[in-house]
């Protein structure tokens, strides 16, 4: 190995060691998401964790966070059909651009999977709100 190759290798190793702790998952943690015994909610949790969590855990990109109970109350009041329509069809802002892309940004999901994820998220929001109140 030449001196230049050794220098490059050493620099690469040092850089790898210095950046080893840099991980996109080192961001602030949200709440521990509940698990429910209902198999449909368990399926919904799996979809939610893989697709919806990125925005809805902490309220990224304008998405209502699961702990933003006041923001969820009017949405829940509209009923589940309305809650299903948003992630299936997408939600546009006043500027005409999608705030939430169609299919919740995951074209591989069937409508039923998106609906289960919405069911899970609403159950989780209600559970977390009760838990926060100490009930």
Which residues make up each language-model segment?
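Bacterial signal peptide processing site
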Residues: 22-26
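Sec-dependent bacterial lipoprotein signal peptides
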Residues: 1-20
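A short small-residue
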Residues: 28-30, 58-61, 96-103
């Amino acid at each position: 190995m030449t001196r230049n190759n050794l220098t490059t290798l050493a620099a690469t190793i040092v850089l790898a060691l210095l950046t080893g702790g840099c991980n996109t998952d080192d961001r602030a943690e949200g709440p521990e998401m509940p698990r429910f015994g209902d198999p449909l909610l368990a399926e919904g949790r799996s979809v939610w964790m893989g697709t919806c969590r990125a925005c809805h855990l902490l309220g990224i990109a304008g998405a209502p966070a699961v702990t933003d109970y006041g923001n969820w109350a009017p949405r829940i009041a509209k009923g589940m059909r309305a809650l299903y329509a948003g992630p299936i069809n997408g939600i546009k802002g006043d500027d005409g651009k999608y705030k939430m892309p169609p299919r919740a940004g995951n074209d591989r999901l069937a409508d039923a999977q998106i609906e289960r994820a919405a069911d899970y998220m609403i159950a989780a929001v209600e559970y977390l709100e009760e838990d926060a109140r100490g009930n």
